[in-house]
């Protein structure tokens, strides 16, 4: 995925990430997602991107504090989203 935008709201980072459209079917709001090996929650899903929120404690303990706009990140989707897709198809 690609970092589109990083906003900081009360020390929490809100990051918008764009991914290939072919992977959108695996994104589920409130489900888990791994970004660069860190397990997080999808806070919002839109047609062209999704958002994650990162609290200060997580930023302190991970490599995510080094992210900036236009960076590429490794994404691993929650198995729940994959199962949901399979059930509906």
Question: For each predicted feature, which ranges?
Answer:
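Conserved loop->alpha-helix
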Residues: 1-89
């Amino acid at each position: 995925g690609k970092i589109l935008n990083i906003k900081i709201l009360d020390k929490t980072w809100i990051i918008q990430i764009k991914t290939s459209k072919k992977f959108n079917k695996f994104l589920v709001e409130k489900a888990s997602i791994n970004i660069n090996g860190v397990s997080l929650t999808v806070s919002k899903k839109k047609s062209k991107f999704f958002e994650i929120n990162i609290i200060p404690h997580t930023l302190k303990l991970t490599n995510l504090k080094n992210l900036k706009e236009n960076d590429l990140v490794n994404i691993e989707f929650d198995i729940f989203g994959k199962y949901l897709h399979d059930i509906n198809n």
